[in-house]
């Protein structure tokens, strides 16, 4: 029936029968077309036709299911056009409506509805929406915590103290997250208990023989392979260079050591050899004929190897068996208590759902699983009778996007497919055993495998939803490509989407960077995409562009700091990258007549000019970047739309409406009340609000308004308000002097608010919100503003949310506000309403995840210099589906907390899995492009970064795995791969790179690397910002004819705030700010602050990036905070403490170099060190906040007006300790000292406030105050 010319591989995927078939379909390989054609061939097979309702087709989304149904329907209809009398076709068209083409959740729901009686669930159950689920979970966990507090449950209290930092909401977050995580396991309770039992080790526990030890060793071997390459490269240089052959022996010994480690299979031997190895010293020979450049190069490479081996040694030292065993034993009670707490929460949550006849989204899969599974006498999980009936029913089970399956879904599909075997637990893990199982009835004809699975593991990007790409990979590695096997795989890697230039570039890049370690698959020639699309010869393809820009300012750090540029830099960098992209788009589009890019239009069958709709800008995440890009593109006149999933609650119209709802629920909230009063809903001016506040500064703003309202209306004040009125005559005078218009305004607002509060009780929340839209006129007002259609759409979404909420079992304004707040501060924030259609001629900005499955003529991948998000690794308890819990070790009695050894292992595992996911996300992004691909990114210090890339080019075929593992951005992967490409030669020359590259790769891919000048883009930005506002105003006024408008504009522009001086006083100051203020007061003019500043060299001219003085101070302060003086008898003790901080990742090895063990020892042995050692009460890094009169800092203010104005001073005291007759205050300084008196004067005011803070907090006298100066290894006393 099909006229399509299928490739041989596609034909195999369509026609292969009687086996489990895994189809690995690369990007653009036409997998959906193949899947649809396979179904059509099945139902129209002349020998063995299968009715379409006998096929189970599982898709990833409802849209995919609908598209598949439509394609099949079109194919059947086309067949009927050719053969109108065909009974087979007519039957299949009829059956299509009841076909089982659906998402996994739709199938599970069908199973539940058909078999509800087997799981004791009410047949009238409904699925609770996200709104109700959030509220029920919060209610359940609040009740559970209250109950456990009430009975003083010891395990629970210990958990709170250990992992909640005295705020049980943090423990609630841990429980909710772990609950969600456990639900991705087929049997959550079993998983939770097994993971806790992993800590229950016996006396015979030997860490060196555990899975943990093997993981550590395997991870380290990846690094060792990199070291081996570096040493082998060095030996090659030694043998091919003049006069440095005496280096050969020590390098050969090092290489033998690395090779020996790589052969080790025993962790004990591996650990012992690394700890014992002593690097041989390099001979100190001088040879005039020696190749100095080669000599220096191999020394640097060896130093890098030595440094990393020392770091591994430090790590391995911590994995001592007895210490590790004690950790496991100590953590077991807490982890068991945590698992039990999650189970208790789940039971309470389940009870609440059952009370309301509800199930949630997670329940759908788990209830289906419980219907389809049974246990045999051996405890193995086997198909239930119901599952066996499904096996009889379905002739074939076809699964789309198989790489995104999770373990629950895999078990479900195995129950309804004809697979031999059973599931069982082994070492806490659920695994499938492909063995014969004994069933009561023989399953005649059901022994023929019937699973069809299609997907691309390189596009598995949903691990955050607990997708498990290993499910696909295990089959991919096990299945054979040979015909006739029961488990077979077919590879579809011919790409029918992209130009050859895009394909070749993607292949080159991923051959260089993707591996089993990072990406979970070796990207070999066999895995590479093959060109399948034809674009003719009329228009030649273009190279892939990489546009780079150095984000460092070429001015001194001091000047940046003075002007707060460091705070604005991040935003400016996004703006500048957005501007760069705008320039590229303008060039691509041209004037739409000539000069622009030509793209092939498949519908027209010819080339045409590029349009804005043909371009997509992809980003890893759009929340912060997209709005800035939209603004930059709009400035250049480029129509643009950003498809974001956040920012909804930050829009002005939604913030205003939520504030209004908050004050209707409770008007005693100043911030939302002022937000409403300043909005068009109430239209109060700043002056009016100040006049209201003058009634009483010690009560809420609403209470001030209520007092005015009651006194103006001659109503008697009740005792509550009377209590707050110290002088009634004074209040009466304020109200009497108040503008009559303002008093009426207040009364009108109070009366409206009371009416709204009353109305909110009697109608549903959705009706009430729409009533407010109309009553206040705010809906119409929002529509009249710029982007009014968008604003009104956002307000309609709030109304729809309220409508959903009204259908739940929760009622009332208070609960609705709580629900909205929960959404706002969780991942439930939404993007603004979508008001653009798919065919609008605009550039689209979207996340890479949103782009999956789509394609565009031009793709611009931006933000490649942005760091990967590794924030989850900082949580105090980590979760891994296979390895279990990775908690901090917290001993509340000894007040000790640090990452446990098992946490460090899990942390590294999650980090590698996250990097693998990022690798696949990058692959998805680059394979969306049909004709043109552009990559943009910012680099911190271009010259140094590119030099680092060059140092990683020892292997022309692969970027070293250790380098890929340490990557923090996409550019950290792309850069080292491209710098050795033949097309990067001119780029290196532009940067005046002197390093010679012996491994230039002559690959057929085409690249164009551009270095953009940030200064030029910044200059344009500054020039725009410097357009005189007054000129714009003048021009506007010239165009106004009606004098009334002129007068109003002049009046508004000449407005002067009554308390202008007060507005410049911050509410909080740090002690450092106070110090700066006093320095400013002492200067005659500000020129003194600038005249000594010198512009430092730009970073690309510096040989090596140095740690700044401020960073150095921070590092030394951090070490002093953790210094244990009792274990600091010599320099070796101090070095050991430094290494411990490196090991615990408080500082890096590079940062540790600024800590002088000699200087620290001098402090320890000095008078102050001895006094600290003798004290029984030593406190370090103590934060404080104290209130002081503003006049104490801002002496220029009017003393009468500002006598009651207060400031909060904040700071952190480095160290204080107690002696018999009082406290001793100590502050560390790392400044360079020229003049002792100058230092004393500089810090005198700072120490004064530290002293005052200590006096107030402790109530004890500070008898001595010292500055310890590390630059001179001495202290000075402050009087």
From Swiss-Prot:
A GO molecular function held by the record: 3'-5' exonuclease activity
Listed HAMAP family: AddA
Signal peptide range: none
Ligand binding (ATP): 25-32
Official protein name in the record: ATP-dependent helicase/nuclease subunit A
Cofactor: Mg(2+)
PANTHER family cross-referenced by the UniProt entry: ATP-DEPENDENT HELICASE_NUCLEASE SUBUNIT A (PTHR11070:SF48), UVRD / RECB / PCRA DNA HELICASE FAMILY MEMBER (PTHR11070)
Family from the record: Belongs to the helicase family. AddA subfamily.
Record's function text: The heterodimer acts as both an ATP-dependent DNA helicase and an ATP-dependent, dual-direction single-stranded exonuclease. Recognizes the chi site generating a DNA molecule suitable for the initiation of homologous recombination. The AddA nuclease domain is required for chi fragment generation; this subunit has the helicase and 3' -> 5' nuclease activities.
Reactions it catalyzes: Couples ATP hydrolysis with the unwinding of duplex DNA by translocating in the 3'-5' direction; ATP + H2O = ADP + phosphate + H(+)
Subunit organization: Heterodimer of AddA and AddB/RexB.
Statement: the UniProt record of this protein carries the keyword Protein biosynthesis: no
Organism per entry: Clostridium botulinum (strain Kyoto / Type A2)
Keywords: ATP-binding, DNA damage, DNA repair, DNA-binding, Exonuclease, Helicase, Hydrolase, Isomerase, Nuclease, Nucleotide-binding
Gene3D superfamilies for the chain: 3.90.320.10, P-loop containing nucleotide triphosphate hydrolases
EC number annotated for this UniProt entry: 3.1.-.-, 5.6.2.4
Classification of source organism: Bacteria, Bacillati, Bacillota, Clostridia, Eubacteriales
Domain (UvrD-like helicase ATP-binding): residue spans on this chain: 4-499
UniProt-listed GO biological process terms: double-strand break repair via homologous recombination
Cellular component terms per the entry's GO annotation: cytosol; DNA helicase complex
Key word Hydrolase present: yes
InterPro entries in UniProt: AddA, DNA_helicase_UvrD-like_C, DNA_helicase_UvrD/REP, P-loop_NTPase, PDDEXK-like_dom_sf, PDDEXK_AddAB-type, Restrct_endonuc-II-like, UvrD-like_ATP-bd
């Amino acid at each position: 029936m099909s006229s399509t010319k299928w490739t041989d591989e596609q034909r195999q995927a369509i026609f292969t029968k009687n086996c489990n078939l895994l189809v690995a379909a690369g990007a653009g390989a036409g997998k959906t077309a193949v899947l649809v054609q396979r179904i059509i061939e099945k139902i129209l097979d002349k020998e063995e036709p299968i009715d379409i309702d006998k096929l189970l087709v599982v898709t990833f989304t409802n849209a995919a299911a609908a598209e598949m149904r439509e394609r099949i329907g079109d194919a059947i209809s086309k067949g009927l056009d050719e053969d109108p009398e065909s009974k087979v076709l007519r039957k299949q068209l009829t059956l299509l409506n009841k076909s089982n083409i659906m998402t996994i959740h739709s199938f599970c729901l069908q199973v539940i509805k058909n078999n509800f009686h087997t799981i004791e669930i009410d047949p009238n159950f409904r699925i609770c929406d996200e709104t109700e689920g959030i509220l029920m979970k919060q209610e359940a966990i609040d009740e559970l915590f209250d109950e456990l507090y009430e009975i003083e449950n010891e395990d629970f209290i210990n958990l709170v103290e250990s992992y909640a930092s005295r705020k049980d909401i943090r423990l609630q977050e841990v429980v909710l997250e772990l609950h969600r995580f456990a639900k991705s396991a087929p049997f959550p309770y079993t998983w939770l208990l097994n993971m806790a039992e992993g800590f229950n080790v016996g006396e015979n526990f030997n860490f060196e023989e555990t899975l943990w030890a093997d993981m550590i060793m395997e991870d380290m071997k990846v690094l060792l392979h990199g070291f081996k390459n570096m040493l082998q490269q060095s030996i090659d240089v030694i043998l091919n260079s003049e006069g440095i052959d005496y280096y050969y022996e020590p390098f050969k010994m090092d290489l033998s050591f690395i090779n020996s480690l790589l052969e080790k299979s025993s962790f004990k031997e591996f650990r012992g050899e690394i700890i014992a190895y002593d690097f041989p010293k390099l001979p100190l020979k001088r040879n005039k004929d020696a190749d100095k450049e080669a000599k220096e190069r191999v020394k640097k490479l060896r130093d890098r190897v030595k440094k990393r081996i020392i770091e591994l040694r430090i790590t391995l030292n911590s994995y001592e068996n007895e210490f590790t065993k004690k950790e496991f034993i100590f953590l077991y009670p807490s982890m068991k208590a945590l698992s039990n707490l999650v189970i208790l929460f789940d039971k309470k949550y389940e009870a609440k759902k059952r009370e309301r006849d509800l199930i949630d989204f997670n329940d759908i899969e788990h209830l289906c699983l419980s219907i389809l599974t049974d246990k045999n006498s051996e405890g193995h999980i086997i198909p239930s009778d119901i599952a066996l009936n499904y096996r009889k029913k379905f002739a074939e089970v076809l699964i789309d996007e198989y790489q995104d399956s999770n373990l629950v879904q895999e078990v479900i599909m195995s129950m309804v497919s004809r697979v031999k075997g059973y599931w069982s637990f082994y070492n806490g893990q659920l695994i499938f055993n492909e063995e014969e199982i004994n069933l009561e009835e023989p399953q005649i004809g059901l022994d023929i495998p019937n699973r069809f699975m299609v997907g691309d593991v390189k596009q598995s990007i949903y691990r955050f939803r607990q997708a498990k790409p290993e499910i696909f990979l295990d089959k991919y590695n096990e299945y054979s490509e040979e015909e006739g096997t029961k488990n077979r795989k077919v590879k579809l890697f011919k790409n029918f989407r992209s130009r050859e230039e895009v394909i070749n570039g993607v292949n080159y890049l991923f051959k260089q960077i993707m591996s089993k370690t990072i990406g979970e698959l070796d990207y070999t020639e066999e895995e590479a995409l093959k060109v399948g699309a034809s674009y003719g010869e009329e228009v030649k393809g273009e190279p892939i562009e990489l546009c780079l820009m150095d984000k460092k300012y070429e001015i001194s750090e001091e000047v940046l700091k003075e002007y707060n540029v460091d705070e604005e830099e991040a935003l400016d960098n996004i703006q500048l990258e957005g501007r760069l992209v705008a320039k590229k788009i303008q060039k691509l589009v041209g004037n739409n007549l000539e000069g622009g890019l030509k793209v092939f239009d498949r519908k027209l069958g010819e080339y045409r000019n590029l349009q804005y709709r043909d371009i997509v800008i992809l980003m890893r995440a759009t929340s912060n970047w997209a709005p800035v890009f939209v603004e930059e593109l709009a400035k250049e006149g480029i129509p643009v739309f950003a498809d974001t999933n956040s920012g909804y609650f930050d829009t002005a119209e939604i913030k205003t409406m939520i504030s209004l709802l908050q004050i209707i629920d409770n008007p005693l909230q100043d911030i939302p009340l002022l937000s409403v009063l300043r909005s068009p809903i109430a239209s109060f001016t700043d002056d009016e609000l100040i006049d209201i506040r003058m009634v009483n500064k010690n009560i809420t703003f609403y209470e001030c308004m209520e007092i005015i309202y009651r006194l103006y209306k001659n109503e008697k004040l009740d005792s509550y308000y009377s209590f707050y009125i110290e002088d009634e005559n004074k209040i009466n005078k304020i109200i009497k002097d108040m503008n009559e218009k303002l008093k009426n305004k207040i009364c009108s607002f109070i009366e409206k608010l009371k009416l709204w509060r009353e109305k909110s009780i009697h109608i549903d929340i959705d009706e009430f919100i729409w009533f407010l839209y109309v009553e206040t006129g705010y809906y119409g007002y929002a529509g009249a503003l710029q982007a009014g259609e968008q604003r009104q759409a956002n307000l309609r979404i709030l109304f729809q949310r309220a409508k959903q909420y009204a259908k739940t079992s929760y009622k009332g304004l208070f609960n609705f506000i709580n629900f909205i707040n929960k959404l706002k501060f969780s991942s439930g924030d939404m993007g603004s309403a979508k008001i653009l259609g798919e065919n609008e001629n605009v550039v689209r900005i979207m996340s890479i995840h949103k782009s999956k499955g789509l394609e565009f003529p031009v793709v611009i991948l931006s933000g490649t210099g942005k760091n990967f998000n590794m924030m989850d690794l900082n949580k105090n308890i980590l979760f891994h589906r296979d390895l279990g819990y990775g908690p901090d070790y917290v001993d509340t009695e000894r007040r000790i907390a640090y990452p446990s050894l098992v946490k460090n292992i899990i942390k590294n595992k999650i980090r590698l899995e996250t990097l693998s996911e990022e690798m696949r996300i990058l692959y998805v992004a680059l394979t969306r492009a049909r004709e043109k691909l552009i990559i943009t990114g910012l680099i911190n210090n271009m010259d140094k970064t590119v030099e680092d890339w060059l140092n990683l080019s020892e292997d022309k075929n692969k970027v070293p795995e250790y380098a890929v593992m340490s990557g923090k951005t996409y550019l950290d992967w792309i850069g080292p791969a491209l710098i050795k490409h033949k097309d990067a030669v001119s780029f290196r020359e532009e940067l005046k790179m002197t390093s010679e590259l012996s491994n230039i790769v002559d690959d057929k891919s085409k690249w164009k690397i551009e270095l953009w000048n940030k200064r030029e883009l910044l200059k344009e930005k500054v020039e725009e910002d410097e357009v005189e506002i007054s000129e714009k105003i003048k021009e506007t006024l010239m165009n106004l004819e009606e004098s009334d408008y002129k007068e109003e504009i002049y009046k508004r522009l000449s407005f002067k705030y009554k308390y202008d001086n007060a507005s410049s006083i911050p509410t909080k100051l740090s002690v450092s700010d106070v110090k700066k203020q006093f320095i400013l007061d002492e200067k005659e003019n500000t020129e003194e602050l600038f005249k000594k500043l010198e512009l430092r060299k730009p970073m690309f001219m510096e040989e090596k990036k140095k740690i700044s003085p401020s960073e150095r101070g921070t590092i030394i302060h951090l070490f002093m905070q953790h210094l244990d003086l009792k274990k600091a008898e010599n320099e070796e003790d101090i070095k050991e403490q430094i290494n411990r901080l490196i090991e615990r990742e408080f500082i890096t090895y590079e940062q540790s170099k600024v800590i002088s063990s000699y200087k620290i020892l001098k402090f320890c042995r000095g008078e102050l060190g001895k006094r600290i050692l003798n004290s029984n009460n030593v406190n370090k890094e103590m934060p404080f906040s104290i209130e002081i009169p503003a006049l104490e800092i801002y002496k220029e203010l009017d003393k009468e007006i500002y006598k009651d104005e207060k400031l909060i001073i904040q700071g952190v005291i480095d160290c204080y300790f107690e002696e018999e007759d009082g406290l001793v205050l100590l502050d560390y300084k790392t400044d360079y000292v020229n003049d002792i008196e100058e230092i004393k004067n500089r810090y005198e005011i700072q120490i004064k406030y530290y002293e005052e803070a200590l006096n107030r907090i402790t109530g004890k006298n500070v008898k001595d105050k010292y500055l310890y100066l590390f630059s001179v290894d001495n202290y000075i006393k402050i009087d």
